[in-house]
Each structure stands twice: as C-alpha cells, then as structure tokens.
Amino acid sequence: MAKQIGIDLGSANTLVYLKDEGVILSTPTVIAIDKNTGKDLCFGAPAKKMLGKTPDTIKVSKPVREGVIADMDDTTLFITRLLEKTELTSFFSRPDAYVCIPCKATEVERRAVQTAIYDAGTKNVSLVAEPLAAAVGAGCKVLSAKGRMIVDIGEGTTETAVISLGDIVVSRSQKIAGATLDRAIMNYFHNERRIEIGELTAERLKIKIGVAHPKINRGEYRVIGRNLNNGMVIASVATSKEIYYAIRPALLSIVHQIRLTLEATPPELTSDICNNGIILTGGGALLPGIADYVSAELGVKVAVAPKPLESVCIGIGKMLESDGELAKILNKDI
C-alpha cells in the first residue's frame, strides 16, 4: 500500500505530514538554481539566506506566491528535492499526496498544483481546501452543525471561511497577508526614513518587534540599509510603534475581509460564531496583539490556534489518521 502524505505548500513555508508519523518536515519554500547549468544548489533555509545576496549566475526562487504556483518548473524541482530529503519517493514507491490550496483557487491554479506535485514523484494527488484543514488542525469540530469561522493569515493570502457540517459555507480569499506586511514595512522606511531595506530585513522587523496594537511595546531593533539620499550604508533604530503604523492599513484590510464574510453568513451561523468566536491560524496569527485587535474591531471573541504555523498540516494529518467521517473530507470535490 502506498504511503500517504499531506503537504501544506505555502508561499513562505512548506510542511509535510506522513501518516502514522506526524509532521516530518517544515522548510522555507525557496530554492536556489544555477542559471548556467539549470541545476539546483540548495533549497529551504540555506536558499532563503541567499535572498538578495546572489550574483547574476544564481537565481533564488520563491516559486509559490500569493498562495498559488508562480513558477511550475521551480515548484516541481523544489517538491522533488523535498520528497527526496524525506526519503518518501523511489523508483518502486510513489506516495499518495493530499495538498492544501486556497479555497478560491482557479481551475488553472488547481491543475498547476496537481501537475507539479505529481511530476515531483507522487502517485495520486488530491486537493484539500486550506481553511477546512486549518480548522481541523486548530481543533474545531468541523462536522458539527454549529458554525465556526477560521481566518488563516498566511504569507501570500488570507483565507476566511465559515464552516459547518464538514464543509465550507461561506469563504473569501484576498492577497493581503504576511508578505503584504513586509512590503508595508519596506515602503515605510523608503518613504518616511529614506532608507532602503531588503525583504529579509523587513520580515525580521515584523517578527522581532511587530505588533498589532500601539500600546504593545516590544522595544527597538537595529536596522542597516541604504541611505537613499547619498547611497551610503546607514544604521538606524526602529521601534515597535513604527512597525504598527506601517502595517496598520494591511491589518484593516484583513479585518474588512472578515467583516464581509460575516455579512454574507446565514443568520443562524452568525449566531454560532458570536458564541464560539473566531480562530486565527497561519504565520500572521503570531503577530502580538492581533487577536485582541480583530476582536476590538469586530466585537467578536477571537483566539489564536495552539500551533498556528502548523494548523493546516496538522489538519490534513488528522484527516489522514481518521477512519470516520473526518477522512471523507479528503475526498470531497472543492
């Protein structure tokens, strides 16, 4: 019998779940390729460290952007190396793969994921709606008639969905997420400080001192960038309050999406959500104060999942390990 794996193919990180073993790998969705030979040099964390630092002969690719495949060849190569590292593929063995995708992905985007994963060395490829997997991984009773709302704030997209009786009732997807916050920080330094900083520096600022409320103080962080006035290297200090004001417009957009989803939700399910609250998953859920921020804006209880970064992958795993109704979700058309 073929092995069964779950794959959370994210814009920032890719996680792999192996049935009967759990999450066996989590690595950045980045691959470095030699332009002259077309061969890959490394992938994951080593490749991510090369972003913005390579000569013209090396391409560092982030093949998944805004939740979908941006470069088919690079994605296939990345997944191939990923599966080789986990020793899940061989000439005699190809695993069955269950892959999460945004609920609003187009037919073309879905086929691209299936093709890339199959070409990387899997046998059968099935697609699973990302918010549904996130809800299961967050511990929600998705088979219940009571409505639950899940907000998965990833790197490339924010998925908002209302779930009841094992399926998605209402959903929205927008391309304002973790990467948007990074760009907002870069733009803030460009416009307000006249300092150019890189993508990794912006991400580091978000992680180290980013907040979703101005009253939360996470201190300061030293930044090194390029002075746009004279082109020289400059060292500066950023505060958590500055980062908040830089990312606040993006946070408001995420709240607006949640509000629109609530407005489109049937009244009985809205009542359930008011009683049960909203669950946040994804890397964006780790931003200090975001649950309180969303709750204050919407007037609804909001909580962060126990393991927000792994919720989607854990959710696929729970479905794979289940012998009951939960397992049937894996085979639903989405």
Regions from the PLM with identified roles:
Residues 1-155, 161-278, 285-334:
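Nucleotide/phosphate-binding catalytic cleft detector across ATP-hydrolyzing
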